[in-house]
């Protein structure tokens, strides 16, 4: 578990005092670095080795002073030696390292001076031993506080997707398939994130695979079975003589590890793939990428059939900002100088509830929750300027405010786990600000993700309409001519009394079902849809029904733009976003695009019609007769 930043700073001060007079490179350098890692509550033995042999350029061989594979390379010199030369020496080791071993940071020191090179950000930092306590935040990657930077097409996200897909394929080839395989991969995703984001001790899971399983992989399946059982067992109920490598794992709960799974069979190749997954830095992967991870292991035919279009965070924000986020920030600006009103606003945030009735692997719910927690932190910064004894008591927003329905079991499992992981990342963000480590373990609350067909179950069974605040998502993009037999039956049921309902695209079923659900409430809805619902024949069928029988009013709309994603074989489609409710509002917003790939230009209008332009709620219906004699 991660130490608080206050504790880390205190340890850094004590470290500096203890080592302020040391000068000899070899005599005490190893003790120096053991103590350095202890500043962050990390055992150096667990993550890094001294004098790591490596082949240099040509036929020469060398030894790295301290090496944490895939993360950190340290070169240590006697006090006063040339540190720039030491940096060159460190870089010269790179050709002898495997790709997965290449470090993200180089750290050079002579006891007195520290030089840290962040190779991914291309940034350098220099400070003295006495200034270390002021710069401990630079070593968040050691403590487990690494921040996630959202980068479209981030290579590490693509690498993670490829590796998980590769592991999926080799397991499936052995006959390990279906529910067991899917649930196993979801558990593995949690374990990978957990050890890189301070839910577990650093490298706890990786070390378990490296040191407690045979190189031929023959015992990995049984070791996983033991591990899953331990993760699902409270400390006071565990065996007294439990192996130390297992006893170190925390109690997770949340039912994630409760179900008994068949034991998978591994070999040496599969073990290597598993370890390659472990060597990635999962702290740099947003849980929102789980959609991409899921899509990357589906075949093309299956993906098209499900209409599984996963998308970028930037596009998701196009929906959630006008739906609720912009309004919440406007209210925050109005009340932030009045602590009483701000506290009431904070309490209100914890009562908001969100439903994605076609949630897939949770992308929309994840980003919505993340943005809610970021706003909560801004509130907490103002309300709690003094030290806080227990930050868990001031964090009121939680994952159980978020609800989803998903027809695919694997995707629903991923969504559930991803919500826990984004919650943990947000807790780390708050921990960093208040200098106090906070983790929600064992898991007591969870997002309410239901594995079911959204068009076949009453949404009231998921969450009562008098409790819900917002509905959001991107229901499947499947045209009316591409529906399978079951989907056609669903459409016939939903549009039973709607004339010509058979020509409507699949997504329109969510519009009608949402319109029925929100009657007599203040619930606001926003869906991403193919632009066919705002042009041509479908407008006269769908919107006539919604306007006439359910009193629907469009509150905001994004006109046609290109909706693409970052997943393998990404699916690009022309879409619109429509925000609506069963009540009217002023200052409606239209987001216009000069072309489908340009940025949006916003304008405020009095009314938005179903063609998503300013105008009255008039629809053009299909006619079989001419308007006048000719």
Please provide the spans of the model-predicted regions:
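A short, conserved, highly charged catalytic patch centered on acidic carboxylates
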Residues: 1-105, 121-122, 144-147
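Preference for the N-terminal adenyl/adenosyl cofactor-binding alpha/beta module
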Residues: 2-16, 130-371, 401, 405-414, ...
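Signature of N6-adenine DNA methyltransferases within the class I
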Residues: 22, 56-62, 79, 83, ...
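Structured loop/turn residues at beta-strand edges in well-structured enzyme cores
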Residues: 69, 101, 347, 352, ...
């Amino acid at each position: 578990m991660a130490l608080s930043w206050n504790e880390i700073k205190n340890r850094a001060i004590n470290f500096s005092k203890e080592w302020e007079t040391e000068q000899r490179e070899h005599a005490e350098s190893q003790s120096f670095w053991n103590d350095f890692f202890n500043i962050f509550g990390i055992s150096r033995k667990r993550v890094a080795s001294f004098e790591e042999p490596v082949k240099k350029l040509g036929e020469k061989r060398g030894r790295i002073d301290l090496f944490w594979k895939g993360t950190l390379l340290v070169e240590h010199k006697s006090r006063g030696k040339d540190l720039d030369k030491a940096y060159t020496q460190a870089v010269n080791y790179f050709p002898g390292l495997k790709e997965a071993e290449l470090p993200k940071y180089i750290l050079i020191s002579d006891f007195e001076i520290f030089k840290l090179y962040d190779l991914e950000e291309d940034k350098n930092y220099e400070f003295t031993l006495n200034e270390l306590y002021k710069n401990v935040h630079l070593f968040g990657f050691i403590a487990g506080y690494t921040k996630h930077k959202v980068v479209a097409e981030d290579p590490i996200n693509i690498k993670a997707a490829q590796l998980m897909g590769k592991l999926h394929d080799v397991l499936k080839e052995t006959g390990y398939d279906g529910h067991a395989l899917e649930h196993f991969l979801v558990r593995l995703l949690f374990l990978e994130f957990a050890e890189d984001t301070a839910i577990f001790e650093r490298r706890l899971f990786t070390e378990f695979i490296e040191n407690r399983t045979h190189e031929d992989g023959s015992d990995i399946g049984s070791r996983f079975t033991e591990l899953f059982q331990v993760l699902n067992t409270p400390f006071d109920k565990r065996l007294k003589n439990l192996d130390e490598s297992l006893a170190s794992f925390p109690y997770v709960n949340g039912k994630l590890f409760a179900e008994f799974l068949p034991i998978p069979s591994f070999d040496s190749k599969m073990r290597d793939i598993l370890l390659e997954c472990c060597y990635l830095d999962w702290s740099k992967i947003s849980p929102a990428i789980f959609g991409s991870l899921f899509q990357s292991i589906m075949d093309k035919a299956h993906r098209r059939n499900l209409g599984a279009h996963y998308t970028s965070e930037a596009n998701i924000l196009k929906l959630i900002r006008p739906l609720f986020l912009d309004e919440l920030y406007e209210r925050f600006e109005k009340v932030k100088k009045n602590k009483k009103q701000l506290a009431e606003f904070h309490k209100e945030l914890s009562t908001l509830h969100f439903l994605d009735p076609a949630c897939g692997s949770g992308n929309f719910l994840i980003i919505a929750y993340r943005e809610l927690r970021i706003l909560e932190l801004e509130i907490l910064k103002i309300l709690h300027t003094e030290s806080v004894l227990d930050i868990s008591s001031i964090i009121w927003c939680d994952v159980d405010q978020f609800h989803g329905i998903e027809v695919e079991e694997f995707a629903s499992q991923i969504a559930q786990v991803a919500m826990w992981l984004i919650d943990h990342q947000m807790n780390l963000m708050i921990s960093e600000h208040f200098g106090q480590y906070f983790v929600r373990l064992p898991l007591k609350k969870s997002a309410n993700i239901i594995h079911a067909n959204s068009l076949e179950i009453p949404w009231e069974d998921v969450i009562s309409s008098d409790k819900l605040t917002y509905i959001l998502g991107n229901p499947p993009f499947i045209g009316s001519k591409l529906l399978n037999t079951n989907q056609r039956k669903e459409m016939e049921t939903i549009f039973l009394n709607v004339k010509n309902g058979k020509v409507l695209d699949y997504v329109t079923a969510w519009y009608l079902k949402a319109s029925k659900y929100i009657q007599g409430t203040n619930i606001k809805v926003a869906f991403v849809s193919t632009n066919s619902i705002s042009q041509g024949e479908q407008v006269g069928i769908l919107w006539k029904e919604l306007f006439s029988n359910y009193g629907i009013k469009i509150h905001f709309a994004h006109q046609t733009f290109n909706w693409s994603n970052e997943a393998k074989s990404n699916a690009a489609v022309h879409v619109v976003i429509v925000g609506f409710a069963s009540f009217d509002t002023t200052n409606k917003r239209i987001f216009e695009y000069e072309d489908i790939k340009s940025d949006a230009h916003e304008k405020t209008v009095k009314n938005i019609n179903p063609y998503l332009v300013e105008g009255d709620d008039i629809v053009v219906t299909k006619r079989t007769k001419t308007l006048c004699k000719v």
